[in-house]
Amino acid sequence: YLGPTADSTMDQTFANN
């Protein structure tokens, strides 16, 4: 996973964990 999506902060949260 290269980074957060602009569409969803939730995606970033789960990807970082």
Swiss-Prot record:
Cofactor info, note text: Binds 2 calcium ions per subunit. Binds 1 heme b (iron(II)-protoporphyrin IX) group per subunit.
GO molecular function, one term: lactoperoxidase activity
Top class in the EC scheme: oxidoreductase
Keyword Iron: yes
Cofactor: Ca(2+); heme b
Keywords attached to this entry: Calcium, Heme, Hydrogen peroxide, Iron, Metal-binding, Oxidoreductase, Peroxidase
EC number annotated for this UniProt entry: 1.11.1.7
Example GO BP: hydrogen peroxide catabolic process
Primary role: Removal of H(2)O(2), oxidation of toxic reductants, biosynthesis and degradation of lignin, suberization, auxin catabolism, response to environmental stresses such as wounding, pathogen attack and oxidative stress. These functions might be dependent on each isozyme/isoform in each plant tissue.
Family: Belongs to the peroxidase family. Classical plant (class III) peroxidase subfamily.
Name under which the protein is recorded: Peroxidase 5
